[in-house]
Amino acid sequence: TGVPDLPVPEQILSYLETYRRLLEGVCISGGEPLLEPGLADLCGAIRNLGLEVKVDTNGSLPGALEVLVRRGVVNYVAVDIKGPPGKISALTGARLPEEALVLAVEKTVNLLRKAGIPHELRTTVVPGLIEPEDLLLMAQWLQDGSRFVLQQFRPDRTLDPSLRQVRPHPPEVLRQLARDLSGFFSECSVRGAG
């Protein structure tokens, strides 16, 4: 076509430059976006356009998140908590030992709290994988000062074919779970449950 291929960050920034007057911010999600070595530079360039930056992470890379925090290029972070200590590796298939994953999540959450970065901790409540007692363990583990969001499981949006037949909890069950956990967090809410 005669048009050179641009690196992905340049394409992103060009698009954002074109539409920035219509946008308030950008959410960088994944996979795990903190695995990308150029993420801090991309976030900085987005901030230089006058846009807010939200990053979604699983909490396993606190060192990479610390770079974003130190450079002041992230406005909000959502940490996907996959399960309570003792179940994270099994639920995610991660190659890291369970203890390393637990420590990484703790470091991530503590970094956000200490730096005063607005954030939320969130868990997708998959029946059969995340039970009410798991949520209580997670609340006891991560309590104090964060927003905790229970996300409704959507079987039509899962990558795992074995979960497509799982029936999500009724919305009232999730709302009751949020009420039960509300004493552990500054706020506990439900997302995607109607």
Which sequence ranges carry the predicted segments?
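Canonical Radical SAM [4Fe-4S] cluster-binding loop centered on the CxxxCxxC motif
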Residues: T1-Q11
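A C-terminal junction/extension of Radical SAM enzymes
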Residues: V173-G194
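Short, charge-patterned binding micro-sites
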Residues: G30-G31
